[in-house]
Regions:
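Short amphipathic alpha-helix that is part of the acyltransferase structural core
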Residues: 2-31
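Short alpha-helical
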Residues: 18, 64, 111-112
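Short Asp/Glu-rich motifs
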Residues: 113-115, 136-137
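Conserved catalytic-core motifs of GNAT/GCN5-like acyltransferases
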Residues: 123-139
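Conserved acetyl-CoA-binding loop-helix of GNAT-fold acetyltransferases
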Residues: 74, 80-97, 114-119
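Conserved GNAT acetyl-CoA-binding A-motif
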Residues: 95-107
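Intrinsically disordered, low-complexity, positively biased terminal segments
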Residues: 1-2, 93, 98, 141
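A conserved beta-strand-loop-helix scaffold within acyl/acetyltransferase catalytic domains
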Residues: 31-75
Length: 141
């Protein structure tokens, strides 16, 4: 599938100040995200209405030429309107233009995000299981 940047999605190599709290709330700490942008290892994608984000994501260098698409978000009142598809498609197009390998990680319970990935033609290639050792020693827990 060929992806094209959406003309309404603002693509920037600088973190959008309106997006930082959104990404932070999703587990991407602001200081880490700002450092990724400062190092030239992140790209911001945002779709706005009336000057406010309605959907956003960012990409960041994960390993060598592999770039993660993360922080995918849409305003709760605007969900199921295709906005996330537009920002993620723009991210995929941008990474393709830069000869970077996109990776889209999603939690197994996030069905809307899984459906978005599948609708975009992405295929599942790694499924991870995590195991935890619970030490009987309290100081090692």
């Amino acid at each position: 599938m060929d992806f094209a940047p959406d003309p309404e999605v603002v693509v920037s190599e600088h973190a959008d100040a309106d997006c930082l709290p959104i990404f932070d709330a999703q587990g991407h700490p602001t200081a880490t995200v700002q450092r990724q942008f400062a190092n030239g290892e992140a790209i911001n994608f945002v779709l706005k209405r009336a000057g406010q984000p309605i959907s956003a994501c960012f990409t960041y260098r994960n390993y060598e030429s592999v770039w993660e698409i993360g922080g995918v978000w849409s305003d709760p009142q605007s969900r199921r309107s295709g906005f996330a598809r537009r920002v993620v498609s723009s991210a995929l197009a941008t990474l393709a233009q830069q000869n970077r390998i996109p990776r889209y990680q999603v939690h197994e319970a996030n069905l809307p995000s899984i459906q978005l990935a599948e609708a975009l033609g992405l295929t599942r290639f790694v499924t991870m299981e995590h195991f935890l050792y619970e030490s009987p020693t309290p100081s090692l827990r």
